[in-house]
Amino acid sequence: MLSNLHAVMDKAEAYAEERKFSPDNYVAMRLAPDMLPFSFQIQSSTDRAKLFLSRVSGVAAPTWADTEKTWAEVKARLETGLDFARSVPAAQLDGTEDKLIPLKVRGEEVQWPAQKYLLENALPNFFFHVTTAYDILRHAGVPVGKRDFTG
């Protein structure tokens, strides 16, 4: 999904270029006044992916400052997230379905099996932020559709 989001960002960049405006305009866009901007959606998407992969595989997660303010910085953040995801060996995830993962869920300390963490926390949060990023760009007029989202 992060690679699909990257492709959507490529289309957004091309759309901005065709229309002669800076893709930096997308960075602060939001769907509603009380929602967080596009930059936050990319930060959260990459955070959800890295935290799941790190917690389950044991591979140390990179730290990111969440200071991206330009299109280039936001895109670089997504690329860094993709690089980390690709670097985690699949073998370190195999057989971890029952591994207990300590989490804080709604302010409560819990230990969930990795499969429950994936299905009830990591994926829903990840898809929420990826979808919101897509929706912000779509709302801005970027000509993308379901196939762009799903790949």
Each model region followed by its residue ranges:
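Helix-adjacent hinge/juxtasegments
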Residues: 50-88
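Generic structural signal for well-ordered, non-transmembrane alpha-helical segments
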Residues: 3-6, 43, 72-79, 83, ...
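Acidic interhelical loop/turn segments
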Residues: 17-27, 87-118, 150
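Short, contiguous alpha-helical
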Residues: 28-61, 109-144
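Hydrophobic alpha-helical packing residues
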Residues: 5, 9-12, 49-52, 81, ...
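Short, highly charged C-terminal tails/helix-capping segments
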Residues: 144-151
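N-terminal structural module
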Residues: 1-47
